[in-house]
Design a protein with these regions (language model features):
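Residue-level detector of conserved, function-critical positions
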Residues: 21-360
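C-terminal motif of bacterial Sec signal peptides marking the signal peptidase cleavage site
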Residues: 9-11
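Sec-dependent N-terminal signal peptides
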Residues: 1-4
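Bacterial signal peptide processing site
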Residues: 13-15
Length: 360
């Protein structure tokens, strides 16, 4: 997640990242969600007659549709919406944290971000408010740190709510592999968000600047490398800030399962950690690899390739999300559902009158 101060006198309009059925050509999921994949429960959100519930891996209803919205389970709990308020349920479908918040985010490291009247704090899994609702905005915890925005700027807090990195930044990204991207303006604070944006660098968990602010864009560290932008091209640095894959890509994404998406002349392909082109740029869009498959966009349709670049699930979907615990969410016209790695539908709105919703 990236948090940016837009205007110190106005409330931030950004909301916590939620998983949803992405629009056509939209493949990319946040790196923070990638990190949480191993903590997901094997239940999948579905909808029936305007209410949402859950199916299991086989496509059978596990929790009867009864919620206005239902999110994926993470760390054993899932966000649900009832009568315009948000709370949490367990895998049995029982409400364990009463719907009472205007906004929530998924649990991460035992705490969940919650919002009331455009202010943010954190609760534990009992629903106890462990960090008072006080911040203009915040992010979920990652490696013991959460981004927190105050009227002074953007900094980081620890799980007790203590500011451990002062709010002196204009933008910040979640910690990943011990480092977090930060950005500050030469013009200082306060400032106009439309002035020259200066550069990004990286700090460690103590707030020490370990990679100087020198890049126009940065991504999170993943598998030891981070994509960065210099002079309009993207390459990769290591955790010491050394450029190990030269910046000659129009776009470069995070590494996942040993490969990273890159873009050259409007086409997308994949490189390995040595910078070698493993799958030549040939796709109109592409996603990160998850469970051995990656979504790609060909001639206005989405399908899936394996790590050799072979198309193993025909490009036939209007949108296709990454595989998570053996299933992927796809859409064809009004038909939405989940497929297995063979491309077979496990569940479909066409024959079960179910559909997915976006979180509003």
């Amino acid at each position: 997640m990236v948090i940016m101060v837009l205007n110190l006198t106005a409330s931030c309009s950004l909301k916590p990242n939620q998983a949803s059925l992405l629009p056509e050509k939209a493949f990319f999921a946040s790196s923070s969600f990638q990190k949480q994949r191993q903590e997901l429960v094997g239940l999948y959100p579905i909808q029936l007659n305007g209410k949402m519930g859950y199916m299991d891996f086989t496509g059978q209803v596990a929790i009867a549709p009864q919620f206005d919205y239902a999110d994926r389970f993470v760390e054993g709990l899932a966000q649900v919406k009832i009568n315009n308020k948000w709370g949490f349920i367990n895998p049995a479908g029982s409400i364990v944290i009463k719907p009472q918040f205007d906004e929530t985010d998924r649990f991460s490291e035992g705490l969940a971000l919650v919002g009331i009247k455009d202010r943010w704090g954190f609760i534990d899994k009992t629903g106890k408010l462990t960090i008072p609702i006080q911040f203009d905005f915040a992010s979920k915890f990652s490696q013991g740190r959460a981004i927190a925005m105050t009227k002074k700027g953007v900094g980081f807090i620890d799980p007790t709510g203590k500011l451990v990195i002062e709010p002196t930044y204009f933008e910040a990204k979640d910690f990943s592999e011990g480092l977090a991207g930060v950005r500050i303006l030469k013009t200082g604070f306060p400032y106009d968000c439309c002035v020259d944006p200066n550069f990004w660098g990286f700090v460690d968990r103590s707030g020490k600047e370990v990679i100087p602010l020198q890049f126009r864009l940065v991504d999170d560290f993943s598998e030891g490398l981070a994509a960065v932008s210099i002079d309009g091209k993207m390459g990769y640095i290591d955790q010491k800030g050394k450029m190990v894959i030269e910046p000659h890509f129009d776009y470069a994404g995070s590494f996942s399962e040993g490969l990273a998406i890159i873009k050259i002349k409007e086409k997308w392909g994949y490189i390995n950690r040595k910078g070698k082109m493993v799958i030549e740029p040939q796709f109109d869009n592409a996603s990160y690899f998850s469970e051995g498959l990656a979504g790609v966009y060909i001639d206005r349709k989405s399908g899936y390739i394996d790590p050799t670049g072979r198309l193993v699930i025909k490009a036939q979907f209007d949108s296709a999300l990454p595989f998570i615990q053996g299933l992927a969410e796809v859409r064809v016209g009004d038909r939405e559902g989940y497929i297995d790695p063979s491309g077979k539908y496990v569940w479909s709105s066409q024959n079960k009158k179910f559909s997915r919703l976006r979180k509003k």
